[in-house]
Curated annotation (Swiss-Prot):
Originating species: Thermosynechococcus vestitus (strain NIES-2133 / IAM M-273 / BP-1)
Coarse class of the protein's main subcellular location: cytoplasm
Source taxonomy: Bacteria, Bacillati, Cyanobacteriota, Cyanophyceae, Acaryochloridales
Record keyword Nucleotide-binding present: yes
Keywords: ATP-binding, Cytoplasm, DNA replication, DNA-binding, Lipid-binding, Nucleotide-binding
InterPro entries with a match to the protein in the record: AAA+_ATPase, Chromosome_initiator_DnaA, Chromosome_initiator_DnaA-like, Chromosome_initiator_DnaA_CS, DnaA_C, DnaA_dom, DnaA_N_dom, DnaA_N_sf
Top-rank taxon: Bacteria
Protein name: Chromosomal replication initiator protein DnaA
Disulfide bonds: none
Domain notes: Domain I is involved in oligomerization and binding regulators, domain II is flexibile and of varying length in different bacteria, domain III forms the AAA+ region, while domain IV binds dsDNA.
Record family assignment: Belongs to the DnaA family.
Region listing for Domain III, AAA+ region, in residue ranges: 112-328
Amino acid sequence: MISSAEDLWHQILERLQLLLSRPTFETWIKTATVQSFDGQTLTICTPNPFARNWLQKYYLKTIADVAREIVGKPVEIELAIAQGAEHDTSIRPTSRGEVEATPPAARHRGSELNPKYVFSRYVVGPNNRMAHAACLAVAESPGREFNPLFLCGGVGLGKTHLMQAIGHYRLEIDPNAKIFYVSTEQFTNDLIAAIRKDSMQSFREHYRAVDVMLVDDIQFIEGKEYTQEEFFHTFNTLHEAGKQVVLASDRPPSQIPRLQERLCSRFSMGLIADIQPPDLETRMAILQKKAEYENIRLPREVIEYIAASYTSNIRELEGALIRAVAYISISGLPMTVENIAPVLSPTVRKIETSPEIILKVVSEALNVPISDLKGNSRRREISMARQVGMYLMRQYTGLSLPKIGEEFGGKDHTTVMYSCDKVAELQRTDPEMGSLLRQLSDRINLASRSTEP
């Protein structure tokens, strides 16, 4: 029995706290209050238009579903802005099925920030520690220490996450802050549209009346002379006004072809923070945190397997986790390495490597000289290391069995086949062997990447 609007909202909050991650709940749900409930419509007040728009876009259906479960019938949700917010003098409900026009103060694309891209969900490791610290410093004191801040790194390494985390952090401190997140492609498209409509003045006011400007994929500005010209003046206007500029690219400014020298100079005059691919421990931590936020229980060996299989970027890593979880959910099988391996194997991209790298990795990791790997010693530790090396060489090279035998001192191809089958069987039945192979695979991947031109 629902005694009041406050009682219903309290029950909804209790359930949402279990359904959503803690940062999401505390940032977007806990700050809202209830205004009324007439038996059919529940009106919820948010502290500002930004929060209202966010709930409307991402959590309205979840709230409605929870309310329906509690009340026992469909409940319509209306979102309103609390009295006094954004200098308003009244509560203004947002009509169902219609998103209210964004107020001028919120028209900057801060409202397009991904709610998951916050600092609390970013896993810090040796590969990104400097970039994370720089972004946090910028978020706390924009326009001071590192301006501009230039983030560079490969695809899927977390540049966009860090950029948008800066925006979220500033909006938590000051909901009225004008945060502008935009891709270089969007900047170019807006510029072209402004030229066609003869509205350059409006374009410039739009892009220059911001507190923090976050520009993604700035490398795509290369060769676009007029875009570079306009961006140069936009950058200067913001920088001279003490406004923070954060740029992200897949390469440092000096390596962006056909970039004007003056832009290259300005992009480089702040801090350039490089983000590298995460190491094995960081990848495992990323998977663990992702699983915790999604309320997924993962055995450690599964985390190790996925982390060792996907080494290039975080996007692929999380995609593999999603595929594994989806398969287990649909099939009803237990979450084990054996069950998820067939689902992930077709898309696991092993790096083609050389026999020399594999011999070196196995020798160093197992403390067995390469001469012994190629020799005929039957000592248990040497024989096992040799078999592991043969297995890995079959996995990571295109060599035939006879060719692999030649790499190990002229062994017969039947010996290679026996060794590969034995190690494969041990991988399925012996957790220690599985862990060893994942560690060696990770080392091979890293060693192979370091030798790429």
